[in-house]
Amino acid sequence: MADIIERIRSQDEYREFYELATKIRNQKLLTDAELHSLNRHQQEVSDNEIKLLTEAWRSSYWNNVGRQLKNQALEPTIACRLLKEISETEALPAYKHVGHHFSTLDQLLTILYNEPQSVAELLNSIDRNDITSNDSTIQVLFHLVYSCALYPEDELKIAQVVCNLLKLQLYRSGSEMRTILRKETSISTRFYKHFVELIHPTMVYLTKALRKGVLDVIQLGSFWLDIDAKQSTARFLRDNKQNEDRLPEYRALVVSKLVDFVDTFLENISKALPMLPPNLNWIIRDIFCSLYEVVDDVSAIELSHACKDMIVSNLICPAIISPQKFGVVDNDVRVGTIVNHNLVQIAMIIQMISLREFESPPEEYKEFLSQCRNTHLISEMMDALLVEKLAPDVEITSLIANGTAESDMATKSSFVGTVADVNVLIKIIRNAPSTSDAKLSRILSVCDKLPATISSTTQKSHFDNLEASPKISTLRNIHRKVQHSFKRTGDSFNDINELGAKQGEALAFGKENFDLFYLEYSPKNYKDVAEADRLKKKAEERRQLADLEKLLEPTPAPKETPVENNLIDFSSGSAETNSEHLSDSTSVSPEPLTSTEELQIGDQGVGGEQRGKLAKLKSLSDRMKKGITQSNTLSDIREHLRRSGSFVKPPPSGIPTSSSEQNLPDVATGPRDDILAKYASISSIKEQKPALGNLIDGTASASSTPRKEPLEPYYSSENLVGCRAFQDTLRKMITVLGNISYLPRIGYRNETKQNEWDKKVLLGRFLDGVLVETEHRREYGLAAQLREVKRCIELFEHAGVEILMDHLKLNEAEQDKIVNGMREERASLMRKSNDISSLEQRVLLNRRLTEQILVDFLMRTFLETGFNNKHTVGKTQEVTAVLKFYDEFKYLRAQDERAEFLKNLLTFLRDRLMQNVDWNFATDTMMSRAMTTIERYVIFAVYDNAFYPNRDADHHRDKLLRGTIAKVSDVVTPVNDFLKIPEHLHGEAPWPSAQAELSMLDIYVTAQDKLNCVVRCCDVINNLVALSSKNAVASADDLTPVLVFVIIKANPRALLSNVQFVETFAGDRIESGRDAYYWVNFKSAVEYIKTIL
């Protein structure tokens, strides 16, 4: 049946038009859809990028708050309010904050971004070795100009600034290079520290290099590792006086453990060298290669050790000491005093290994250095960085940084910062001394265009206006402020008396400090100094040439115009009024005055101008009275007025002299032609200067009129495809057929005449059918377009229509190329959107780490000193409650009583925290984090009693089970029958990621953290099972057997005590939900292991 229908349709003469119109319509729909999707996706990507840059700014400011708290430059009492203000700040377009200065600011930021060498020289000139001022300067540049090194291009620009700045200051220091790096007070070392601590690739490298070693040290537990033998002896004798004979054995154990840890760290650092960020590698290499040839022999040795210090002493050792700060381990892991002490000892030994070639190590280090097996790895690592062949990524970075190759790295689309940041930046630049350097001079000159201090032009919020409104009484304002400030206070108002003092402290962080804006950045807008000077010189030459052409332009000679007998008496009182009426009643504009004429008129003044008008009119009247022939037309009179050098203007009075004059706009309020002329090109000015006489008379001399080339005819049968008629018709048909959503059904066929019809006739009948349908639907606009198409087709002969149809078919391929181009652009936008999402996750991770560090610091302050009774003598209620908990917890024997006691304490501390004035401003995530920190802080001190309620019995039980599991672990495989692991899951065995997660179970101190560890382990297994089976989620039959195998292989140190601890203190968190499901599977696996042993 389908073949019959196709055979019938193939005989239809209109089929070609139907198919062509359908294809054009389909292409139009597809193109419109792609264009709409493209525009929508572009807007989404643009909005998401602004949100990303805003979030990066917030994260940077949170880091700044953390540094100020650590340096005691910021009161902890206002930290929550400040963080809340930062979190709620949204970016607006720059012009809404800085007004008309946004273009100058854009120019300044673009120059700073693209000239890192100039920025380095600028910073070097203002360096005063003051940590506070240097950190403030670096902070502004870091997040305002370089967007927190978010994009690869931003990271490279910061690397160039750091590298050039270090080269300037290290070369100046000579043999004191390492001293500068150790002090960390100069702006170069502060910038380097900022760079390595905050860029994401550095954190990735440190995680790879240090995570395993740090976790090993944490799992060591409460065992002190001391380099100093005297300190180690004192610790041992204090705890084991009766076993003094075993002191040598204890000291040997300490030394062996320290040596093993150091060797492990050095091995992992060396293995992680390929993950070292290319920009950091390039900085070290470029500094060494650039300065090695220009310094003396002593300084060259100093330089090599300085480069080693930049990696070991200034990056690796600080990360070992503070692993949570660099994201090496999670903040969920409690790093106590003993663990921190042990990490410091390890870092000191590694630093001494790197220095031993330059300095003789102290006596207490020699014992460790002689036993370490991997001391050579640091020298080999530095040789790889400084001497050996560059890695491809580092070589590309070097070429781009040195200007040899153009950068193809992704970059940002906007600058994001606050008005306060801009003011700090202006102050920094203006403090720089004057210089002869062209690039620095340009930066200073652009900065001078900005005011010394910029104030935001944004209107105040509705809430602020409401507060200032006199219509609201004072009592109502106070009531609303109290309600707003004490939204979490509840029934306790013990801290109301401090409200005024707290608000006074917070004035330092007013709203104007966080007027956040975004300013569009385009690399195409940047011109280097040489290019800018060239363009400026070229523009000056064009201006001088234009002035010269104006001076050399000939003035047309006046010609006599005969005037007929009918004279107009210009000497009468109505002469001026008549002339004004004549001048206003025509639409022809006078010829613009030359510069000489303008100068003459300007010198005459107002009175002189009026006297000149009257004198010239009187002269013209006298000439007419003496017998000059007069014309009945007005053009001749205007010609006389033009030749006389003045065109009569309306009188200065407010009374109009003609009806048309009432409709003329006021000159003072209208656009100034002389101002607009400044922005017009020379060519447009020339085109707008026709002679006034030519416009009036309609004649012009042959010498003044340019000779025009004859235009090609609109339709040409000889050049059919190239004529304008063909191109216009083709375009119109594509447009009209693309807008038609229906096609006519022509059911009548005249067989007698059908053979005589050609394509032109058939096309006309087809369009007639479309036109009738269009008119019936009252689509008058489309109907008009169809008539126009029919009119255009009538121009062509039958062969021309054939060619036209062929070109319509060829246009289909061109439209396909356009659609493919749109699809490629959409794919590019999708990749960029995915990159933005990845960068957002990175920013949120860094912010979460910063938030955890900040909340931990604030919680320690809250528990140790108390916020609400800061100025009173004695312990706060929080500290008293915690100390009471420590004293009474050890006397409780039943685990249920202990769990209830801990729950009551946490509830009390949460209530006290909610009643605190300052913590009313904390976000929900901060409150949740605060309670987690409080629980860790409290349980850490009583962990041994809570974890081992039966003391030695629990220890013995865990030790016995672990030994038995260890024997099974050596022989167990996934194919053992007692495991009953499905065969299709064997491909992912032995599930090392799950084993690694479960092996950290003992390092957590709270029930929730231990439960999270089990959940992560089960999640890993679930994801791996999903890879090997078609099921998206693993069932219990898949999960439990694999979990049994993982537990046996991981073999936690205190498995049974961990299960007991979570069951006791986790509470309702293991009663329902996803965590409860995983916990039930874990308990089942543990019970099964106990039965098979």
From Swiss-Prot:
GO terms for cellular component: clathrin-coated endocytic vesicle; cytosol; early endosome; endocytic vesicle; plasma membrane. The record marks R182 as: Arginine finger. It is found in: Membrane; Cytoplasmic vesicle, Clathrin-coated vesicle. Changing C1017Y: In ar507; shows endocytic defects. The keyword Membrane applies. PROSITE patterns: RAS_GTPASE_ACTIV_2, VPS9. Residues 955-1093 form the VPS9 domain. GO terms for molecular function: GTPase activating protein binding; GTPase activator activity; guanyl-nucleotide exchange factor activity; small GTPase binding. SMART domains: VPS9. InterPro entries: RasGAP_dom (IPR001936), Rho_GTPase_activation_prot (IPR008936), VPS9 (IPR003123), Vps9-like (IPR045046), VPS9_dom_sf (IPR037191). Gene3D superfamilies: GTPase Activation - p120gap, domain 1 (1.10.506.10), VPS9 domain (1.20.1050.80). Residues 547-610, 643-669 are annotated as: Disordered. Belongs to the GAPVD1 family. This is Receptor-mediated endocytosis protein 6. It comes from Caenorhabditis elegans. The lineage of its organism: Eukaryota, Metazoa, Ecdysozoa, Nematoda, Chromadorea.
